[in-house]
Structure formats: C-alpha cells, structure tokens
Amino acid sequence: INSPETPIFSKRRVIYSIDKSKRSILDTKSVIVCEGQLDTIACHLAGIENAVSPQGTALTGDQARILKRYAEEVVLCFDSDTAGQQAALRSLDDLLASGLAIRVAVIPKPHDPDSFIRENGAESFKQLIDEAPGFFDFLLSHLCHTHDTNSDRGRIKIVHEMRDAVQKTDNP
C-alpha cells in the first residue's frame, strides 16, 4: 500500500482519501489525520468521513498546505505506539507553520484508530476526537513525561522547547 518515493510518485504531496473526504472536511472545517491508510478506511467505515492519512510516516509541509485549503483545524490521530507519537511530533512543525489549529487525539495503548473503533465503537472514537487537547496542551504533557519536572534542568528544557514551539507559529 505504501509505495516508495519516485520521480513520478511524490509521497510528500499525496494525502490518502482526500478525494473521498473533501466534502466532509469542508462541511466540518476539520480534518482527522490518521497515521495509516487502514486507520483511515476504518474511520470511513465507521461513518467518520473527514479522515485522511499522509503517505509516509508523518505529515509534510506540502500536505499541510493542501489541508489548509479545506480545513481550519487538524486533529492528529496517530497510533499509540512510540513510532506513532514520534510521527505526530514530527508533523507538528509543518502544521504550526501552516496556521491550522491543531489538536492531538491520544489513542489509549495498545490501540490504533482501527483497533480502537473495532473494540470500542465509533461513538467512543468520536468522543476521543471531540475531547482531543490542543497542540500546546499535548506538547506540554509530552514534555513533562519526557523531562524531569522535579529538577531545574528538566523544567528549563520544558520551557525552552515550549518557547521554540510558540516561535514556530505564524502568530506575531
């Protein structure tokens, strides 16, 4: 399903299911970005039609600019494993630069969107999406779990990384 980058096939510009999701994205002004194509298919089968996925492991700047044409908000909904969370973090820089509002849905371990929907149902998944924290809340929580909040060094790292994230936004 996930072909390599070639001169003919530019993964950084392809968004899986954008053709099927465009109307729903325009209507809701929001797009759910899943990590993989099977997660996107599971969302569509569950009636969540504003779901798409990037080609490759993270959303690119080109893909963020395409999504900006249709949506005001992006909800990242990547897998709960380490690779999924790292892909979400890699996507954030380009999303911040795009000017889109960003929220990050955290899927409980050991799930991905597909398995979460199968086990808990579409309504539980929609609730997870609706309650997804904003980007800065997600980042602060992530940094607090990554760095020692009981040491000055850890708190300084958190402050510096939060500052760096704020500086990447297009807001003055």
What residue spans do the PLM features occupy?
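Phosphate-handling DNA/RNA-contact segment within nucleic-acid enzymes
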Residues: 1-70, 74, 87-88
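Glycine- and other small-residue-rich loops at beta-strand/loop junctions that grip anionic moieties
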Residues: 10, 32, 52-56, 80, ...
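Generic hydrophobic alpha-helical scaffold/packing signal
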Residues: 22, 68, 92, 114, ...
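Acidic, metal-coordinating catalytic cores used for nucleic-acid/nucleotide bond scission
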Residues: 38, 59, 79-88, 106-111
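Short secondary-structure boundary/capping segments
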Residues: 47-51, 91-94, 120-122
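Flexible glycine/proline-rich, aromatic-decorated loop/lid segments
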Residues: 64-67, 93-95, 130-135
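Phosphate/diphosphate-binding loops
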Residues: 74, 82-102, 106
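C-terminal or mid-to-C-terminal helical accessory/interaction module adjacent to the motor/catalytic core
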Residues: 99-172
